[in-house]
Amino acid sequence: MKTLALLAVLLGGISSATAANALDCSAEKTKDYRVAAICRSPKLLQADHDLNEAYQKLFNGRPKEEQLVLVRMQREWLLSSREVGCSSTKEHPEQEEECLYNNIQGRIDFFHSAEGIGGSTQGKLIFKGYYLPKKKESDISIEVSVFEFAEPDSVGKIAFNKYAEALLADGKQRGHDDNQGDGSCTGSCEETTMMSQPFQSGKFISTPVDRWEATGGAHGIGGTSYDNRLLNKAEALTFADVFPEYYAAPIAKLCWDQVAPDGNGPSLATDGNYSFDGKEYPAIPSDEFMKAFKAPTGWSFDGKAITVNFGEEVLGTYQEGAESCTLPYDSVSQYSRLYPLPGSPEDLALQARILKRREATKSGTGN
């Protein structure tokens, strides 16, 4: 998967970005069964071609400073996001093909939306970044990559742009503070903050923000949070924007049943579940669980469900790992203040009607 010619171009620099071609299907490259599977799939080969074409069109139309950020963003997508959610085994080639195809098409849609075209876009995006390489061994490399709305014509877009600028400013400040040559860094030290591909529909946008810090030891720290916004509001999304408070308990129970079935799960997710002096204390969601569950910075959207990501050590020790639950729209829509839910069939139908009305107005045929 990671041997695409486009990847080689990106890693080699931006000067030859227009030369990106389809997947390398030479005998040497197809020793990797994943590459071989793609090379046998006309559907994926065409999708790869379309991806390169969409990337080149976006890249070629942007100034050099935006090109530099796009290169890094696309490099990270190819290395870490292309195969997200897809099977890595040979036993499920059809499912893997469909998953990879959907991921590639989603990336193409993002490139289109970055130009301000397409049914689910909120306007043209511009790309910004800050990169400070190590100058000496004791330094820390700093990299920040974000995007902003080119025309922030709503309070939500203005707030989103301010958030992106704050990420850049923080990276620059850390670059100043951390690179003082104090000898605290003795290995491969780096800090990365990167906006990943957003989900957007109607007046809503959900943007993953990936953070990673390596301090030279065996492990690094980091994770993904989500900037979720209604674009007609200046504030980031709150639980109350989506669900009334009095529905918090039944909705949380749907999630808790996945994270701690029968009360068995991460140590901090559950209260009760024990007997004392002959009295039973049944398992219930803990205060820690409820607090984390109700924080939309852990919510990701895909148009079909809300996934709640708790992160490591939120509900238990490091060894207990990260936990998450998935709430399909059809299980929570009855509770939601948002109607239609972003990306749902009802929302897509609404956006199609709005787009049709706009086009009719532009052509002079609308009412």
Label the predicted regions:
Residues 5-15:
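Bacterial N-terminal signal peptides
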Residues 24, 31-49, 53-60, 66, ...:
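Compositionally biased intrinsically disordered regions enriched in Thr/Gly
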Residues 18, 69-70, 292:
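Intrinsically disordered, low-complexity regions enriched in Ser/Pro/Gly/Gln/His and often acidic
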Residues 71-83:
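Acidic helix/loop microenvironments that form the catalytic cleft of cell-wall polysaccharide enzymes
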Residues 15-22:
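Sec/Tat signal peptide C-region and signal peptidase I cleavage site
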